[in-house]
A protein has these predicted regions:
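Helix-loop-helix
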Residues: 1-59, 105, 199-202, 217-232, ...
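Generic low-polarity alpha-helical segments
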Residues: 84-87, 96, 508, 529
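Short linear motifs in intrinsically disordered/low-complexity regions
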Residues: 8-10, 68-71, 154-155, 597
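Soluble non-transmembrane domains of integral membrane proteins
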Residues: 88, 93-345
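Short, Gly/Pro- and small/polar-rich lid/capping loops
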Residues: 54-91
């Protein structure tokens, strides 16, 4: 048997990797001056936001009016909208805001024309807007008894701002008389992203044509917030609750359209922020549409996708009567879970099936707990260590299987030579050898299969976890995005126009791992030249595809592979003894072995195939 010893080159490689990591950590620590500069920058940004809010309030107090001297323009306007010309065409906006969200509602159309998230900025330090500069439109289309087809965007609403306890209430009325009107009523609670939105009317029975449906029309272009528009676009899509609490979504990569029934809510998700419309009674039907606006990576493109929803509504006794809610806020499970009765947390892309379950009930709460008292990057490292410790029994089983196969290698090679011209006989004798030795060639695959759900769950967790958004670690300024350390003057297909460091470290670690698990056996077993190709291909694929992925995921795989390597080294050098394994296998060969059902079935199938082969030759 070969003498067990540590490869000095492998040890040197590990030491160098840790040395680089420690140096990068020390090198990238912000200085006290940099921390002070960041604090000053944030204070300037908050002051600018406050100044803008105050200026907006002053604007509301003194609304700008249409030039009423132009009698022809006024007459034309009143002629077009008929009875709703009672309300004076007064331009202006009203502000609703609390500590988390800022809204501006326009007199024209009565709709929200600006929605800003307080406390959040984009990758280039601009406040996060979900609605701005006409990117969104909400309107009701209806017919009147005098055969006009009106759109609420063409109507002027009269604003009245009041208080209901601690809540702010904005009543927007498009009047046909002093006591007859269409009303949009917004109600904002302190420190909440959910806005109550009621549409009702009074005295419009006979003015609105009740024989024709009301059409709700909601459109939005999703504003870009991240440094990679392609990456953000991958997680920007329409999600909706329908048909008995089923959660569905439109395609994220191409134009898509669906008509659904019993729709409870519609979410326009912009990666880490969402605009959601809920309806208390459920929409009977809703036609949903999504158009992809991103064809390639761009640093100047403003919008990622264009969304649209068309919903028919019925009048209630000849009047408007609909209870909605607007949600403008982060796609954060901690926030959305506050509205359990609406089920808005289901709009978060946890993943499907068991992968979503693992993300939602294991990784999300564990990471939330760890990051509550640890730096965000360190929390990932600790979570990785916990996962690897939990999976260490599977790692042990995998390495034990490899050790047994290594001990049997000379006998397998002998069988390959003896039956090189008879593949079926070679397979039968190999299976017989495994059975006698008490070795299962599939035992090494089972641990890998057990880890697959974790792999795919993490693939969704890191790029969509709001807790990681704009959280720095070492050289990475955002663990939910890529960690570019160099910008290229050109774009490499599939790779990008930048170089990310964590994917490089993860690729190096997985290369060493594959060297340990496949490198020693790749030249002597049949088919192993292909394994050498895979050993080089896997790290290369990680390097290429993870270059534009969440740096938190690359950090996880870097640390995970390092831990796995050290666990396997410990198992190899301090736990498993190949001499004992060899002796155990030889002892197993002496014992009578009874075929299990699977082995018996496999043997019978191979014998039948052999018989058919012989018959074919005759």
């Amino acid at each position: 048997m070969e003498e067990k010893k540590l490869d000095i080159n492998t040890i040197i490689g590990f030491v160098l990797i840790f040395g680089i990591l420690i140096f990068m950590f020390w090198q990238n620590q912000p200085t006290p001056e940099e921390l002070e500069a960041q604090k000053a920058k944030q204070e300037q940004l908050e002051a600018a936001e406050m100044q803008k809010a105050n200026a907006t309030k002053e604007e509301v107090a003194q609304p700008k009016t249409v030039d009423l001297q132009d009698s022809m323009a006024v007459a034309s306007y009143k002629s077009a909208i008929g009875a709703f010309g009672y309300t004076a065409p007064t331009e202006g906006t009203t502000v609703l805001e609390n500590d988390v969200v800022y809204l501006e509602i326009s007199n024209k159309g009565g709709q929200i024309i600006e929605a800003k998230m307080k406390g959040y900025v984009t990758y280039d330090s601009i406040p996060v807007y979900l609605i701005k500069d006409g990117n969104a439109n909400f309107a009701l289309n209806f017919s009147t008894s005098d055969n006009r087809v009106l759109n609420t965007n063409d109507l002027y609403f009269e604003p009245t701002l009041s208080k209901s306890g601690e809540n702010q209430v904005l009543s927007m009325k498009a009047k046909v008389a002093s006591d007859k009107f269409l009303e949009y009523r917004y109600e904002m609670k302190p420190d909440e992203y959910l806005i109550g939105f009621t549409v009702r009317s009074q005295g419009l029975n006979g003015i609105v044509n009740s024989s024709k449906p009301i059409d709700l029309d909601w459109k939005m272009k999703a504003i870009r917030h991240s440094k990679s528009i392609q990456y953000e676009n991958r997680y920007t899509r329409v999600t909706y609750n329908h048909d008995g609490d089923k959660i569905s979504k439109l395609s994220e990569g191409s134009e898509d359209e669906e008509t659904e029934v019993d729709v409870k809510w519609i979410s326009y998700r912009q990666h880490f922020f969402s605009s959601i419309l809920t309806y208390a009674d459920k929409f009977e039907t809703a036609k949903l549409n999504s158009v992809n606006l991103v064809e390639e990576e761009s640093h100047t493109q403003q919008f990622t996708k264009e969304f649209a929803a068309e919903v028919p509504l019925e009048l209630q006794g000849g009047e408007f009567a609909y209870n909605f809610n607007w949600y403008y806020g982060p796609t954060d499970v901690k926030v959305l879970a506050q509205y359990k009765e609406l089920g808005l947390e289901d709009s978060i892309p946890f993943g499907w099936g068991i992968f979503g379950w693992i993300n939602r009930y294991i990784f999300t709460p564990v990471y939330t707990f760890l990051s509550s008292f640890l730096p965000y990057g360190i929390a990932i490292v600790v979570m990785t260590i916990l996962v690897r410790l939990i999976m260490s029994p599977a790692t042990y089983k995998s390495y034990l299987s490899q050790a047994k196969m290594k001990v049997l290698k000379p006998e397998i090679t002998e069988l390959n030579e003896k039956y090189k011209d008879n593949a079926m006989k070679k397979q039968q004798e190999t299976m017989k050898l495994y059975n006698k030795a008490g070795v299962s060639p599939m035992s090494g695959c089972v641990p890998a299969l057990l880890q697959m759900p974790i792999f795919y769950a993490l693939f969704m967790f890191f790029p969509t976890s709001f807790a990681l958004r704009q959280k720095p670690f070492l050289w990475a300024d955002d663990l939910s995005s890529y960690d570019a350390i160099a910008q290229l003057p050109f774009t490499i297909p599939f790779y990008g126009d930048h170089v990310s460091l964590f994917p490089i470290l993860a690729s190096v670690a997985i290369f060493f791992y594959m060297m340990m698990t496949t490198g020693q056996n790749m030249q002597t077993q049949p088919g192993m030249p292909n394994m050498k190709f895979i050993m080089y291909l896997s790290p290369l694929m990680m390097l290429v595809f993870f270059n534009n992925y969440a740096s938190g995921l690359s950090l996880y795989y870097f640390v995970s592979n390092l831990i796995t390597i050290f666990i396997m080294l410990a198992i190899k050098n301090f736990i498993l003894d190949e001499d004992k394994i060899h002796a155990q296998i030889q002892e197993n060969k002496k014992k009578p072995k009874k075929e299990n059902k699977f082995q018996k079935k496999m043997r019978e199938m191979m014998e039948q195939a052999e018989e058919q082969k012989k018959i074919g030759k005759k």
